[in-house]
Swiss-Prot record:
Top-level taxon in the UniProt lineage: Bacteria
Official protein name in the record: Beta-ketoacyl-[acyl-carrier-protein] synthase III
PANTHER family documented for this protein: 3-OXOACYL-[ACYL-CARRIER-PROTEIN] SYNTHASE 3, BETA-KETOACYL-[ACYL-CARRIER-PROTEIN] SYNTHASE III
Catalytic activity: malonyl-[ACP] + acetyl-CoA + H(+) = 3-oxobutanoyl-[ACP] + CO2 + CoA
Species: Chelativorans sp. (strain BNC1)
SUPFAM superfamilies linked to this entry: Thiolase-like
Pfam families: ACP_syn_III, ACP_syn_III_C
Subcellular location: Cytoplasm
CDD domains referenced in this protein's UniProt entry, alphabetically: KAS_III
Alphabetical keyword list: Acyltransferase, Cytoplasm, Fatty acid biosynthesis, Fatty acid metabolism, Lipid biosynthesis, Lipid metabolism, Multifunctional enzyme, Transferase
Molecular function per GO: 3-oxoacyl-[acyl-carrier-protein] synthase activity; beta-ketoacyl-acyl-carrier-protein synthase III activity
Length: 323
């Protein structure tokens, strides 16, 4: 059977780093308060010349370089973002043009922090269905542009950045030993939409709006939803938590990540943590963490890797793959 295998991974972060100490000078907050509740120590914030598309392009080029491929080898681009360059056309189309790609097709996906997991799952379906051979999947965000910088409960949490992977069709045996994507599951429940949202949009307020969040409500639901969808993936693949080599979770809050790993029975040393470096970068979070683990020499060929994310909506999902 056809599997979608990971050929390469890449990342891009804005030049400017904003530490918790920097935020202390403009908000009634403290480094201790932020670290204790979230695990975040710093985040990257885009400058005026850095956009979702430019960051996505940079991450894509690094992923292509890691894969040993040229832009002309790509026939599908899926960009997960909630902060597109324009209302339309899709940021994916702009990145396609920036890369000089004229073939194939490109589109955006919007599932907020779950976006990259949704995009990987979607690209996998196109590859297994024979509509694409090589896909560039990008998570890119400039969340700093939709933050209310007077709201200390939200603006300290988020950062900007982009991550990308190249997926390629490869023939597998159809069992758990195959390389590539082995199982995936997606969920959404719109009854929670007012717990994490942006209070603007072209069809309603005709403005961009700002991010609003009921942090305690999100935290209350997160661990249960995350572990439920992961257990679904484990069941599909016929594995247990002990079989996992690396757990690459959405990097929103270290307490949520730790609690999810503990409930699932995933050992602490298998959990990838980058929230301290990047903050919550929404759809860019998972590929940024994945790239970090690869660049640090942690994830090796043959490792069983679990990806997971949860975001506004609520949306949530998980992907199991062998590196």
């Amino acid at each position: 059977m056809i599997r979608s295998t990971v050929r390469g991974v890449g990342a891009a972060l804005p030049r400017r780093v904003v530490t918790n100490k920097d935020l202390e000078t403009r908000l009634e907050t403290s480094d201790e308060w932020i670290v204790q509740r979230t695990g975040i120590r710093q985040r990257h914030i885009a400058s005026d010349d850095e956009t979702t598309a430019s960051l996505g392009e940079a991450a894509a080029l690094r992923a292509l370089d890691a894969a040993g491929l040229a832009p002309a080898d790509i026939d599908l681009i899926v960009v997960a973002t909630s902060t597109p360059n324009n209302t339309f056309p899709a940021t994916a189309v702009e990145i396609q043009e920036r890369l000089g790609i004229r073939q194939g097709f490109a589109f955006d996906m919007q599932a907020v922090c779950s976006g990259f997991v949704y995009a990987v799952t979607t690209a996998d379906l196109y590859i297994r269905g024979g509509m694409a051979k090589r896909a560039l999947v990008i998570g890119a965000e400039t969340f700093s542009r939709i933050l209310d910088w007077t709201d200390r409960t939200t603006c300290v949490l988020f950062g900007d950045g982009a991550g990308a992977i190249v997926l390629e069709a490869e023939e597998g045996q159809g069992d758990i030993s195959d390389r590539g994507i082995l199982a995936e599951a997606l969920r959404s429940d719109g009854s929670h939409k007012e717990k994490l949202y942006v209070d603007g949009g072209p069809s309603t307020t005709r403005t961009v709006g700002h991010l609003r969040m009921q942090g305690r409500e999100v935290f209350k639901h997160a661990v249960g939803m995350i572990t439920d969808v992961i257990e679904d993936v484990f069941g599909q693949a016929g594995i247990t938590a002990e079989d996992i080599d690396w757990f690459v979770s959405h990097q929103a809050n270290k307490r949520i990540i730790d609690a999810s790993a503990k409930k699932l029975g995933i050992a602490e040393e298998k959990v990838v943590i980058t929230v301290d470096l990047h903050g919550n970068t929404s759809a860019a979070s998972v590929p940024l963490a994945l790239n970090h683990a690869v660049s640090q020499g942690k994830i090796q060929k043959g490792d069983l890797v679990l990806l997971e994310a949860m975001g506004g909506g609520f949306t949530w999902g998980a992907v199991l793959l062998r590196w």
